[in-house]
A protein has these predicted regions:
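A short, N-terminal "cap"/entry segment at the start of jelly-roll beta-barrel domains
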Residues: 1-44, 124-152
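Residues that flank catalytic or metal-binding motifs in active/ligand-binding sites
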Residues: 33, 67, 104
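Short, well-ordered beta-strand segments in beta-rich or mixed alpha/beta enzyme
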Residues: 47-52, 71-74, 88-90, 99, ...
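Short acidic-glycine-tyrosine-enriched beta hairpin
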Residues: 78-98
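Conserved short histidine dyad/triad with adjacent acidic residue
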Residues: 29-62, 92-96
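Glycine- and acidic-residue-biased ligand/ion/polar-headgroup-sensing regions
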Residues: 54, 63-78
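Ligand-binding loop in jelly-roll beta-barrel domains
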Residues: 93-122
Length: 152
């Protein structure tokens, strides 16, 4: 039966995003790595998995948009509280964070709707946004391709 209206996507390149479990992690430091799951260019939102080894300290930062975090395993010291496996936190736009510390090896899902600015006592040090995450994903894909071709 035909549909009463045309509901085909206006943009024909719209498609699902699938990231396999074996997708590569990107090392950001010896104590921290990230796996980029999705980048939404049209909204500036991105989704990523982060794995921090016990003792890793993330620098002070400010959220320029809301963000969601869900702890899959481990334990994080965030401001004056502790997030455990199974805990969810929403961080609104404008929130300032002091250092965040991994109290155990920790993996968490992070969905951010905009940029995050990092700073120290001397001021702004760097930022992360969808463009940075897109570059990281492209870098990981490029590194994974030779391994996949070698396996064939």
């Amino acid at each position: 039966m035909p549909l009463p209206q045309d509901i085909r996507p206006v943009f024909q390149d719209i498609q699902d995003t699938l990231v396999r479990a074996e997708a590569p992690w990107i090392e950001q430091s010896p104590m921290a790595k990230v796996k980029v799951l999705w980048v939404g260019r049209e909204t500036g939102t991105w989704a990523s998995l982060h794995h921090w080894k016990k003792g890793y300290v993330a620098p002070r930062h400010k959220h320029l948009a809301g963000a969601h975090a869900y702890v899959l395993s481990g334990k994080l010291q965030v401001r004056d509280g502790v997030l455990n496996a199974g805990d969810y936190v929403y961080e609104p736009s404008g929130v300032l964070h002091d250092e965040t510390t991994a109290l155990e090896d920790t993996t968490y899902l992070f969905i951010c709707n905009g940029a995050v600015l990092f700073f120290d006592e001397n001021g702004f040090t760097r930022y992360t946004n969808w463009e940075v995450m897109e570059k990281l994903r492209a870098q990981a894909d490029a590194q994974a391709t030779p391994r996949a071709e070698a396996a064939e």
